[in-house]
């Protein structure tokens, strides 16, 4: 958790944004950290964070940018892994006005389930700020040496889809998935993770994460090269890397229109570039043969090629 805490503290210290971007960040922090809550025939706005720096940023921004006072309540929750500190930013006055200002409700005072339209259709600076705020509220980052991922837990499916949509405007493909009834937005490509960290403003943490990951990968590769024939391994690694690039391109072409079995096979190829087809088949759920996984990847690439040709024909 130390690196994740460092990332969130670095993001909380980020400066230089425009007023519109600051508002987008605050709106995302409230949307992903909590939101509008009914309490005893009235409403409050609350957002729960695991970082005091993050909570203080929101409290100060609500006062300085929106003109609303907030309080921070410190709570300690006992878990099997030890105590967890949380910080609740709470607004109890002029709640409806703040909800309108931050896009929690629209002009008809209906709750917005995704991101405010001003953010979704806003500038690149606003989009980066929205991702920053969402990550500060509910972001997770893999430890170096483990399978790479950057993930944000989302309050609704609409919020997850909106976050994926604005990520595409940044040139990054984020995936929406449902995990035990929880909506998640995930990045698994290390280069995309590093880029997103930098876009959000965590440049120092991005360098640290990438450096430690590279060290771990170098050690792993050295161990594997010591146990296998160099030429064969490099040849296989090159073929797997090329296949992974083709699958990534197929995902970009097809978007969400991919059969689940083909998507699973393609994702395994992307997530485990160093593994053989036989190994991919063994880690698939349920397990399948190497011929089956090769066939699914082949059909995925054929489907993408067919789709590209159809689009090219339509564009003539």
UniProtKB/Swiss-Prot annotation:
Residues 276-309 bind DNA. It comes from the Bacteria. Pfam families: HTH_WhiA, LAGLIDADG_WhiA, WhiA_N. Disulfide bonds: none annotated. Keywords: Cell cycle, Cell division, DNA-binding. GO terms for molecular function: DNA binding. This is Probable cell division protein WhiA. It comes from Bifidobacterium longum subsp. infantis (strain ATCC 15697 / DSM 20088 / JCM 1222 / NCTC 11817 / S12). Involved in cell division and chromosome segregation. One of its GO terms (biological process) is regulation of sporulation. Belongs to the WhiA family.
């Amino acid at each position: 958790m130390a690196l994740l805490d460092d990332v969130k503290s670095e993001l909380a210290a980020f400066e230089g944004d425009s007023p519109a971007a600051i508002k987008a960040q605050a709106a995302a922090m409230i949307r992903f950290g909590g939101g509008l809550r009914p309490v005893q025939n009235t409403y409050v706005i609350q957002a729960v964070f695991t970082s005091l720096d993050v909570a203080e940023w929101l409290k100060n921004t609500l006062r300085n940018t929106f003109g609303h006072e907030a309080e921070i309540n410190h709570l300690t929750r006992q878990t099997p892994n030890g105590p967890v500190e949380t910080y609740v930013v709470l607004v109890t006055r002029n709640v409806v006005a703040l909800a309108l200002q931050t896009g929690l409700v629209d002009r008809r005072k209906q709750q917005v389930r995704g991101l405010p339209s001003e953010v979704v259709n806003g500038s690149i600076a606003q989009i980066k700020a929205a991702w920053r705020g969402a990550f500060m509220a509910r972001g997770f980052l893999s430890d170096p040496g483990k399978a790479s991922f950057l993930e944000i837990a989302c309050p609704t499916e609409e919020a997850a889809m909106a976050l994926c949509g604005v990520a595409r405007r940044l040139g990054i493909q984020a995936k929406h998935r449902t995990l035990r009834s929880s909506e998640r937005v995930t990045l698994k490509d290390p280069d995309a993770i590093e880029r997103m960290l930098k876009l959000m403003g965590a440049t120092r943490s991005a360098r640290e994460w990438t450096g430690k990951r590279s060290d771990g990968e170098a050690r792993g590769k050295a161990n594997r090269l010591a146990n296998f024939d160099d030429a064969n391994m490099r040849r296989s690694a090159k073929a797997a890397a090329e296949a992974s690039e083709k699958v990534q391109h197929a995902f970009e072409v097809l978007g969400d229109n991919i059969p689940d079995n083909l998507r699973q096979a393609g994702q395994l190829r992307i997530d485990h570039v160093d593994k053989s087809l036989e190994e991919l088949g063994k880690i698939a759920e349920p397990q399948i043969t190497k011929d089956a996984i090769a066939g699914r990847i082949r059909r995925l690439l054929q489907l993408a090629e067919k789709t590209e040709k159809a689009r090219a024909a339509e564009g003539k």
